[in-house]
């Protein structure tokens, strides 16, 4: 017996192909629901016993499906049918002359034209379409997109996308199964350290290290998904770095003054350092060290100057850390060197002196701009506004809110998130910054939790990709404008088509 393939070629019947196809479908179901070897052999025997010299490959597949259905192997049948459909779509994708021509023209444009000449190279504003890695990424994206349409979705969805009725965002990442945007919980990463896959990073102990690791966390996460990376409470997460830096500066400054005044024989430096280790805020006064100076005016002045200088040094170092953070996120590469990380940060509600110092210096660094004064594209910054925190003149962070207005007037960022709005306020719990709504790079917010209402928080949350519907197209089609305009809008037809697309 010979088998007629879809292209008309004749090949000898090969029973192993039936066996392999059914066994592939078997692998996807539980063992007790799989077609047995005897059942597979019966199908093979049935085909071989047919009194035919030639048989179409589609007829063999129909026989397999009918037998699986008759013997109640429903899950195996579903897997086999899906495999058959995917193979059919793949053949159509790569044998359809019109589609193949369009695909090859796209690749031709990527290879032979500049971004100024080719729209495909400008599809993503965060990718330099003229760079080697940018072009390589777009080659891969186009191939992956065609693979997704051929193997991972029904033909009607792929056709609707190609015809412009819908737009399936990030289709080139469909095959990878990655998430879109994510709110990174830096607290977990900082406390235990983390690995980027090429080595483990220890817990940071200075505001410079905190800002560097925050940028690295964003860059690393960018390589694990296709969307944007966001930090939901930047000020809260980096505040401990300010305190650690202050304590380090205070130890060094006091020791330097003691050396300068030649007081090492009269002062127990180790005891002073133990007291500094207990400090839990940068808001300390000279009274904290009273037991060390007692009646010595010289020692009292020494501690006063040390506290003042340490605060100044910490503030300056925090500014430098924020400046480095902004520059890093606008220069460090991710995704094979084709993009800078698409990043967002939320801040503005930490009223501690450490958190306020982070917020203030980040906005000042953003206001200063990049090397030649350019407006930083990233990170997208969102200032969280809350009555009792920063909205009214009597609120502790009101000065930072005013600074955000000044910076945004010059740099377009920060934007503002109003925590007292009707769709944000129900989630807010005083004293728990995790319940403050934060926004991601794609401008979305995720905080509600229908599975566990006790975990309605922002850190660690994210989303999947989106599909847009071309409302103007169906509006024009059923409306009173355009070359096929109706005398009266067909609202019923509009909603019927909208329902179908949804």
Q: Language model features by range: what are they?
A:
Residues 1-110:
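Charged, amphipathic alpha-helical regulatory modules used
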Residues 89, 96-502:
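Conserved catalytic cores of very large enzyme subunits
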């Amino acid at each position: 017996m010979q088998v007629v393939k879809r292209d008309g070629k004749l090949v000898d019947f090969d029973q192993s192909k039936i066996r392999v196809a059914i066994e592939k479908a078997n692998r996807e179901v539980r063992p007790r629901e799989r077609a047995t070897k005897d059942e597979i052999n019966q199908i093979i025997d049935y085909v071989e016993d047919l009194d035919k010299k030639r048989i179409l490959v589609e007829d063999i597949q129909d026989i397999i499906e009918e037998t699986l259905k008759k013997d109640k192997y429903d899950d195996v049948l579903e897997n086999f049918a899906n495999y058959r459909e995917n193979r059919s779509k793949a053949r159509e994708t790569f044998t359809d002359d019109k589609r193949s021509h369009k695909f090859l023209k796209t690749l031709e444009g990527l290879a032979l034209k500049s971004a100024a000449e080719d729209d495909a190279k400008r599809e993503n504003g965060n990718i330099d379409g003229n760079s080697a890695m940018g072009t390589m990424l777009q080659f891969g994206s186009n191939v992956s997109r065609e693979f997704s349409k051929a193997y991972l979705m029904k033909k009607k969805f792929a056709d609707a996308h190609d015809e412009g009725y819908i737009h399936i965002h990030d289709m080139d990442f469909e095959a990878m199964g990655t998430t879109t945007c994510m709110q990174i919980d830096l607290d977990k990463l900082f406390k235990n350290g983390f690995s980027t896959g090429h080595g483990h990073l220890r817990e940071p102990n200075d505001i410079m290290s905190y800002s560097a690791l925050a940028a690295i966390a964003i860059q690393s996460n960018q390589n694990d998904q296709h969307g944007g990376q966001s930090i939901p409470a930047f000020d809260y997460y980096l505040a401990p770095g300010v305190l650690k830096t202050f304590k380090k500066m205070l130890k060094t400054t006091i020791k330097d003054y003691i050396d300068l005044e030649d007081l090492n024989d009269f002062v127990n430096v180790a005891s002073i350092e133990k007291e500094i280790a207990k400090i839990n805020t940068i808001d300390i006064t000279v009274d904290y060290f009273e037991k060390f100076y007692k009646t010595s005016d010289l020692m009292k002045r020494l501690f006063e100057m040390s506290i003042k200088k340490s605060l100044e040094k910490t503030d300056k170092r925090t500014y430098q850390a924020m400046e480095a953070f902004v520059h890093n996120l606008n220069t460090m590469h991710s995704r094979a060197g084709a993009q800078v990380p698409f990043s967002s940060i939320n801040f503005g509600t930490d009223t501690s002196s450490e958190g306020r110092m982070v917020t203030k210096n980040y906005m000042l660094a953003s206001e200063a701009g990049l090397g030649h004064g350019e407006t930083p594209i990233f990170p997208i910054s969102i200032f969280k506004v809350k009555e009792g925190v920063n909205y009214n003149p009597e609120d502790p962070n009101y000065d930072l809110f005013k600074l955000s207005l000044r910076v945004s007037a010059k740099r377009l960022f920060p934007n503002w998130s109003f925590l007292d709005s009707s769709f944000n306020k129900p989630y807010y719990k005083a004293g728990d910054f995790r319940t403050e709504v934060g926004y991601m790079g794609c401008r979305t917010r995720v905080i509600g939790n229908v599975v566990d209402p006790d975990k309605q928080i922002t850190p660690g949350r994210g989303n999947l990709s989106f599909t847009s519907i071309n409302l103007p197209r169906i509006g024009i089609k059923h409306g009173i404008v355009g070359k096929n305009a109706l005398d009266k809008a067909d609202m019923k037809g509009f909603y019927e088509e909208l329902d179908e697309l949804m």
